[in-house]
Amino acid sequence: METQRASLCLGRWSLWLLLLALVVPSASAQALSYREAVLRAVDRLNEQSSEANLYRLLELDQPPKADEDPGTPKPVSFTVKETVCPRPTRQPPELCDFKENGRVKQCVGTVTLDQIKDPLDITCNEVQGVRGGRLCYCRRRFCVCVGRG
């Protein structure tokens, strides 16, 4: 009788451990990388924009220190540039060439790396020519920045 109880208890623990092992990897698989979270923010910017063309990530500032909790809002700073793709095409911005003399916007705010939670708090302001002592020249998909920085 004692052996049956021990066996039943062991079976329950084994089942719990198996379920835990199945749940933990799927939770971590839902976390985005810092860059993916920023690209999601750019997509949201394009969805909410009333401008004619899509914007694409031009420059991503350094990510913050590593934080194990994907649900914690992380500060973010990045630059986007107008592309040649019209917004209604719904083409991925990464496949669009930058528009010559297109608008450039500096964006700051917070993102989370959790795919389930989706709080984004991003504000973008248009930049005029020089940013932080640097001037960037962009041709199609490539940009060269000169100056300090």
UniProtKB/Swiss-Prot annotation:
GO BP terms: antimicrobial humoral immune response mediated by antimicrobial peptide; defense response to Gram-negative bacterium; defense response to Gram-positive bacterium; innate immune response
Cell location: Secreted
GO molecular function, one term: lipopolysaccharide binding
Disulfide partners: 85-96, 107-124, 136-145, 138-143
Principal subcellular localisation of the protein: secreted
Residues spanning the signal sequence: 1-29
Role played: Microbicidal activity. Active against E.coli, Listeria monocytogenes and C.albicans, in vitro.
The protein, known as: Protegrin-1
